[in-house]
Amino acid sequence: MATRRQPLIVGWLIPGLCAATLVVAVALAAFMALWFNAPQTDIRALLQDSYLWHVLRFSFWQAFLSAALSVFPAIFLARALYRRRFPGRVALLRLCAMTLVLPVLVAVFGILTVYGREGWLASLCDRLGIEWAFSPYGLKGILLAHVFFNMPMATRLLLQALENIPSEQRQVAAQLGMQGWNFFRFVEWPWLRRQILPAAALIFMLCFASFATVLSLGGGPQATTIELAIFQALSYDYDPARAALLALVQMVCCLGLVLMSQRLSKAIAPGISQMQGWRDPQDNLRRKLCDGVLITLALLLLLPPLLAVIIDGMNSGFSSVLSQPILWQALFTSLRIAVGAGLICIAITMMLLWSSRELRLRNRAFAGQALELSGMLILAMPGIVLATGFFLLLNNTVGLPQSADGIVIFTNALMAIPYALKVLENPMLDVAERYNKLCQSLNINGLNRLRYIELRALKRPLAQALAFACVLSIGDFGVVALFGNDDFRTLPFYLYQQIGSYRSQDGAVTALILLILCFALFTLIEKLPGRHSQNHSGCGKAASE
């Protein structure tokens, strides 16, 4: 009879519990600090406020339209990008991956330059004698900006799902003569389906909680989201109770949607191998033309706003801005925050997924979803509420620190966790399903498994998740807006100061530098695993060692 006492908590569950406890405790502490610092307010009066319900309806409607307009075209664009190889494809994929985390002020500046009433398209229509009736303000402008930010990200996630389809499935389908709708339905759709709902839920939450985009392009109180209403409640009315109630409504809506998407998305068994650049033997000219049109339309959506930022940034004040020490101080501060936040984000995300995938493999899907839901809590928590809660919490306890580096790095790391979760969730689950039995038979666990199996098998997804987290942190403005000053400024904060002091030419140069920095950092991090790195390469060799 066995006498060895079993541990109360198995080892693989400890990382996820620690990470989930940390994230939930931080979010609740920030929320409660805001709630308890609010004066007594009649909650019933707030719930009966007609403007509150208008904001809620508009937030839902624009988020639904934004998610639908982002995900539906991304399905066809991802299939086109998977089938085609052309010069600049790698650069286009990097652009698709980083548009979501581009600094909002930079992207909105480019969108207005192209689609504004005095923009490039308006000038072109005027020369052609056509009336330009489109306005980039209001619901149309918000949807345009949200599609610009989110459709490329959805495309990248769906392309990753297509690349994970085992080559054996494609070969069997080709031998059976399966093509068109049947090929999509039986081969591609099962893999796309498990990524579509989580991606749509992520985009819905991003648009539901949109702040800077709606602030810039909303055009008035008729186009206001919950996050913007929270900002107004804190900045203009200083009504913390109203802000806390709005934040609670947003968290309930977003977390409910995430839980529903996780329940509906089905896991499928992993295949044997993947083949990059599959060539369909039944390819034809019509398919090539359709794919070419889709890729061209995507380029016409993405490139003009970025070109506008580049052209406006190359002005006569370029050299004088580069010679300013303040610019380089802000640049190095942004890099320090980005790298620190990115590494912390990846560590917490892997801890969450390490435990949640083991729960899923043991048929405890609900417990695994609960762990992952804790990581999505930060996305549901409005950034301005999180930052304000930290400010009040520190001010009422230990006092505000002299340097805001630690607060900004940790807050940005938490806010990047949902992005890293979406990138790493399926790859980590696939690796576990593929190598769990091998690791158990060879007694590879803990740090040894992390070193010899996970880090080798997940080189590319880890690099992509780190790139997302770093670029998102380098372009963040919401947290720095509370703690930034003349001694602590990042590039977005410096850009905000330039715009506020009506130095538009200097601001255009700073926006260009910020754009170049984001693209260079993303490219550098994505190249870290090596050009020929595969998701599962080297694992069998590592296990044999």
PLM regions: where:
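Peri-membrane helix termini and adjoining interfacial loops of integral membrane proteins
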Residues: L34-A45, G116-L128, G218-E227, I268-M275, ...
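Short cytosolic juxtamembrane segments of multi-pass membrane proteins
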Residues: P270-P281, L361-R362, L528-E545
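Short helix-to-coil transition segments within interhelical loops
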Residues: E163-L192, L359, K437-L458
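Glycine-rich helix-loop "coupling/hinge" segments at transmembrane-helix boundaries
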Residues: T113, A212-Y238, D476-S504, G538-K541
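Membrane-water interface segments at the C-terminal ends of transmembrane alpha-helices
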Residues: P7-T41, S50-E163, W191-S216, A243-Q262, ...
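Membrane-helix interface/capping residues of multi-pass secondary transporters
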Residues: L52, Q169, M178, F211, ...
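Flexible interhelical linker loops that connect adjacent transmembrane helices
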Residues: L264-L294
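Short amphipathic alpha-helical coupling elements at transmembrane boundaries
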Residues: A45, V90-L93, D126, S167-Q175, ...
